[in-house]
């Protein structure tokens, strides 16, 4: 029989329906707390659980007194809403290790031969301690503590592992938090926040629109299943610090939310995942590496659990408030390593001298781009239209096929032509740079016919390739449709030497914006289990250290050349720990309303410590791709950009960046105008907000027209106006709006930080359409009405007090 158990807090009066909670005597101040007994009134008083209760400012937690399992979690904002759906067989921690054959094995708390759980404290706070010994009859012990005070926001969790069994522990999963699929409240409000996804952040809703979006529903299989294999980190970038850009998860509905985070300031490697674990879903954390083969280690940081009310912005704000106090969070306006040319927000334009038309055909070399000097008049057309300087990113230049590092030299157009083109660009006030393909070794390219087996052997490639626990080379998987490549380990000296040599050579050509770590998503270091590299044989904090070491060598190369204008970037949002190492980050955002709607500007909300660019990437619906993408870049604080075509226009298609130029998509004139207006606002009155500021939770905006159309059999429904709230250094408040349509849009804006005006001089509306205009915007307190011209953007800026 399935029972629902309820608890009674000392803060609640009376018994809750369906349950009675008994406080046993003998738990006086300073003495060990006795467990409470939960009885079900409908079962004749039969005991169903023995529990310890811990309380914080915002929630009440209950633990099984026999094994320390978290069995109840209730927010004080919704005391009748149970978050937990813990099954009796769920462990409280798991340990993944490698056996003598270097195969993965897993141990759980349920295999402990000795278990002791105590709870000490009084009304001022309690500490739950659980100790587990002789796990699977090995000389292996785990102890964890949970500390909670009714005056503090979070419960704090810590764990210590003592390994005298001599096994190689790869990771420890802790805590074990299994939440209910159904939380009650408004069903459509149930949402999950994940600080990782290919564009910037992911929001999974319980009941999304009918667009194929993922849903929180185990029946539909939208979440991957929890299993031992799900936590085997042997390749890729899906970890922190890396593609997982921050260390928190949030799960909420319209009534309350649960927040889980690691407060790690030193870049220890971990994975945070949301997985299907019947009867609920699991908010999981695995802590990788640095566990001793002999001896003890306490986790170097706390895991915190707390509650919140609101939406994903409110959950993310909790994490941001902590993250911005850490060593990596130097505000952009205080950084001294960001060159002036980048602070001027040049429009980023990608040039592809080597073109794989649809990622299925042999390489094409466009005659319009070679020799490289032919690009200059085409770029001049772009610069004239957008009325801004350019950052020209050369892509697909490799002799052996696009993205075929490291055997890629010489450039297909020749180095002399390239250097001359860089000079011509610099004469016009532009910068030239490139994207590489990160720390991997391409040994075969289908489009160019390249076979690099001999080069791989000649240059000792095997010495720098990442290895699986069995010692096999790690083959990349996502790129197999057009090339074959190995992941390379930054913990191998050869990997770093080749990388530094290539970056040094590019600096010598005059390149300044360099994205070497393209495809190391989020500035990730690939995991490696090699026995002969400069690191322990498995993932761990060495990965963070080797990224720092590599970036320091890049900086020495630019300083040694006197190239102070060189910047480094990485694909997607640079993870928080690596923010000081990079000056810009290539965020491939998906615009509002795009397809499944899972993408959210989480990265842009959390971090603005390096400059965000969009360049050639980003998703937006056709045939208005450039207009929509540029409008989204505007309100989310990114430099706009696009792909150059042979007639000096942008590729205005929602397609891969290597797509064919013809037939054209959308209006070239509208694309130019949207980029121009966005850039004018960003470089002008919006600079303190969009460049140096911080994104806030958005205002309420009424009157936004939904634009609906069908194009190439794809239905689209996109808001006509995008908007975001921002705060400049010093506290000035502003609301940024962008109208990507060719129609005038009138909106009503509501926000508590909009003061009432008498003379109309407290708030100004600064618009960027055909000309940059500044005008007073009078109105009642908390309200303003705004009219946006077609293809325009604006900022409602509250004057400094």
Stretches found by the model and what they are:
Residues 5-27:
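N-terminal export signals
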Residues 20-49:
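C-terminal segment of N-terminal export signals and the immediately downstream linker at the start
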Residues 54-65, 69-76, 81-391, 412, ...:
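Carbohydrate-recognition beta-sandwich/jelly-roll modules
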Residues 284, 296-302, 543-771:
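Active-site-proximal substrate-binding groove within the catalytic cores of carbohydrate-active enzymes
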Residues 357-460, 497-498, 542-552:
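Aromatic- and glycine-enriched glycan-recognition loops and surfaces
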Residues 438-505, 599, 603:
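Active-site-adjacent "subsite" loops/lids of carbohydrate-active enzymes
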Residues 487-577:
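Active-site neighborhood of glycoside hydrolase catalytic domains
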Residues 778-801:
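C-terminal beta-strand-rich structural cap/linker in extracellular carbohydrate-active enzymes
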């Amino acid at each position: 029989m399935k029972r629902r158990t309820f608890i009674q807090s000392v803060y609640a009066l009376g018994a809750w329906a369906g349950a009675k909670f008994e406080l046993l005597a003998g738990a006086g101040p300073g003495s060990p707390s006795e467990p409470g007994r939960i009885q079900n009134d409908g079962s004749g008083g039969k005991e169903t659980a023995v529990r310890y209760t811990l309380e914080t400012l915002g929630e009440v937690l209950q633990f099984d007194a026999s094994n320390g399992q978290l069995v109840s979690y209730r927010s004080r904002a919704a005391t009748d809403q149970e978050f937990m759906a813990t099954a009796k067989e769920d462990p409280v921690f798991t340990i993944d290790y490698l056996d003598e054959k270097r195969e993965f094995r897993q141990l759980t708390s349920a295999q402990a031969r000795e278990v002791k759980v105590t709870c000490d404290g009084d009304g001022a706070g309690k500490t739950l301690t659980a100790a587990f010994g002789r796990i699977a009859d090995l000389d292996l012990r785990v102890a964890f503590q949970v500390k909670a005070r009714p005056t503090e926001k979070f419960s704090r969790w810590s764990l210590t592992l003592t390994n005298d069994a001599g096994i190689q522990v790869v990771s420890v999963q802790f805590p074990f938090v299994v939440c209910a699929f159904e939380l009650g409240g408004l069903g459509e409000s149930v949402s999950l926040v994940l600080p990782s996804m290919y564009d910037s952040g992911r929001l999974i809703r319980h009941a999304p629109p009918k667009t194929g979006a993922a849903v929180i529903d185990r029946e539909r299989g939208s979440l991957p299943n929890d299993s031992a294999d799900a936590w085997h980190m042997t390749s890729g970038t899906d970890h922190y610090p890396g593609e997982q850009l921050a260390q928190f998860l949030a799960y909420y509905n319209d009534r309350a939310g649960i927040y889980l985070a690691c407060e790690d300031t030193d870049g220890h490697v971990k994975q945070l995942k949301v997985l299907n674990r019947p009867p609920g879903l699991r908010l999981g954390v695995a802590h990788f590496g640095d566990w001793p083969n002999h001896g003890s280690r306490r986790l170097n940081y706390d895991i915190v659990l707390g509650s919140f009310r609101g939406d994903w912005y409110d959950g993310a704000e909790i994490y941001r408030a902590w993250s911005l106090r850490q060593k990596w969070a130097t505000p952009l306006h205080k950084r001294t390593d960001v060159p002036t040319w980048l602070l001027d927000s040049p429009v980023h334009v990608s040039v592809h001298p080597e073109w794989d038309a649809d990622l299925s055909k042999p390489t094409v070399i466009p005659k319009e781009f070679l020799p490289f000097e032919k690009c200059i008049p085409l770029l001049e057309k772009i610069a004239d239209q957008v009325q801004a300087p350019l950052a020209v990113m050369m892509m697909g230049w490799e002799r052996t096929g696009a993205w075929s590092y490291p055997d890629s030299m010489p450039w297909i157009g020749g180095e002399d032509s390239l250097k001359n083109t860089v000079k011509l660009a610099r004469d016009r006030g532009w910068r030239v740079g490139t994207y590489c393909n990160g720390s991997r070794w391409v040994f075969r390219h289908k489009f160019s016919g390249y076979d690099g087996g001999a080069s791989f052997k000649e240059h000792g490639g095997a010495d720098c390739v990442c290895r699986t626990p069995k010692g096999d080379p790690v083959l990349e998987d996502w790129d197999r449709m057009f090339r074959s490549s190995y992941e390379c380990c930054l913990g191998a000296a050869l990997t770093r030497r080749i990388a530094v040599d290539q970056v040094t050579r590019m600096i010598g050509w005059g390149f300044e914006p360099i994205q070497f770590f393209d495809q190391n998503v989020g500035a990730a270091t690939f995991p490696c289990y090699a026995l002969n590299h400069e690191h322990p044989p498995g993932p761990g904090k060495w990965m963070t250290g080797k990224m720092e070491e590599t970036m320091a060598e890049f900086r020495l190369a630019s300083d040694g050349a006197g190239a102070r204008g060189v910047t480094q970037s990485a694909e997607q949002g640079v993870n928080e720990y690596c923010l000081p190492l990079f000056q810009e980050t290539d965020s491939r955002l998906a615009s509002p309303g795009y397809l499944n709607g899972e993408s959210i500007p989480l990265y842009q909300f959390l971090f603005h410590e390096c400059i965000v660019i969009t360049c050639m990437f980003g998703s937006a619906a056709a045939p208005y791709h450039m207009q929509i993408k540029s409008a989204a870049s505007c309100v989310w604080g990114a430099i706009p950009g696009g792909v150059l075509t042979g007639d000096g226009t942008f590729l205005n298609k929602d397609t891969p960046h290597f797509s064919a130029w013809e037939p054209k998509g959308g209006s070239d004139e509208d694309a130019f105008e949207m980029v121009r207006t966005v850039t004018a606002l960003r470089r002008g009155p919006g600079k303190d907000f969009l460049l140096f500021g911080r994104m806030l939770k958005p205002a309420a905006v009424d009157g936004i027209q939904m634009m609906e159309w069908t194009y190439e059999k794809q239905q689209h429904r996109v808001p006509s106006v995008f908007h975001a709230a921002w705060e400049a250094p010093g506290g000035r408040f502003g609301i940024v709006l962008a109208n990507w349509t060719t129609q005038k849009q009138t909106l009503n804006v509501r926000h508590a930080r909009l003061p009432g005006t008498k003379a109309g001089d407290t708030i100004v509306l600064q618009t960027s359409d055909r000309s940059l205009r500044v005008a007073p915007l009078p109105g009642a307190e908390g309200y303003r009405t705004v009219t946006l011209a077609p293809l325009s953007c604006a900022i409602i800026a509250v004057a400094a007090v």
